[in-house]
Amino acid sequence: CACLVGSEMCIRDRSKMEENKVMNIELTPEMFEKLDDSKKNSEKIAYESKTYIADAWNRFKKNKLALIGLCFLLVMAIGCIFVPIFSSYTYDGQNMANTFAGPSMDHIFGTDRFGRDVLVRIMYGGRISLAVGFSAAIISLCVGVTYGAIAGYAGGKVDMIMMRIVDALYSIPDMLYLIMITVVLGSNFQSIIIGICISSWMGMARQVRAQVMTLKEQEFSLAAFVLGASKKRILLKHLIINSMGPIIVSFSMLVPSSIFYEATLGFLGIGLSAPQASWGTLANDARAMISSQPLQVVWPILAICLTMLALNFIGDGLGDALDPKKK
């Protein structure tokens, strides 16, 4: 035992002596190497500062289908807006000597039973269909966000009463709203938008309410309340702003559904009256000739399908781009 203790003490003494030697080494300038300018930032972690929108756009661009859908929608919108510049034909100009003409250089999609250019009518119809879709979606967005945010933030009996009203309205089929409104107010642009809005805002209200109820218990919301922020400021500046991701995605899904509702009304014969034409009314006009002139039905239905597909691709891309969990 005594030998073991003695050996341990010797080892400790040697280690202390080595440490003292290291500490007593004199440092001179020749022992150091001057760092070059090229190596000064070698250990610096450099990254580009990006805003939330820029970061979301970079992720959105990586989704090829979403980017294709956006390009298609832009081309369709430009064509619908500037069709009078691109073509000398009008949507109601008739030429009875050139009815049911096939696709050609003069008439790319052919002509209808009155000799009207089908492509021009589809472009003019796209004006109405896209205008109805985006207008109804924007109004539904405003109503649904306001209603759902108030219900979610108020809570208690206010929330219960407001959401029971939504449940009661939600139990009625959407098409019944549309048919009732168009029958009462007439088949015009305004009545179709009102009918779509009445049937579309409730889903948005439910989603916003769920988001607000979750966010109002978060630390940043409670901190704003403790610091004396008003309820209006908390609701607008903190809760709704932090819910914009799901809101934008829902809005992108509202647009194709609104276009579909308008097209359904037109196909049922209770849409816009002639000579105005949307994609749905164009398909309805050609329905009687589906056996003899199938292309007359194919073109407007193809425009509806491609536009809705593009909008759904955009919605999926926005959902991935705005989701913080997928960064």
Q: Language-model features: where?
A:
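Gly/Trp-centered helix-boundary motif
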Residues: R14-V145, A149, G156-K157, S258, ...
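Glycine-rich helix-loop "coupling/hinge" segments at transmembrane-helix boundaries
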Residues: I181-L185, I196, Q211-V212, F260-A303, ...
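Single conserved hydrophobic/aromatic residue that forms the stacking wall/gate
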Residues: C1-D13
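Generic hydrophobic transmembrane alpha-helix motif, especially the helices
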Residues: I108, D112, V118, C142-G144, ...
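Transmembrane alpha-helix boundary and packing residues in multipass membrane permease domains
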Residues: M76, A149, L178-V183, I192, ...
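Amphipathic cytosolic juxtamembrane alpha-helices at the membrane-cytosol interface
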Residues: R116-A131, S135, G155-M163, M213, ...
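Loop-to-transmembrane-helix entry motif
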Residues: N63-L67, I122-G125, S129-G133, I165, ...
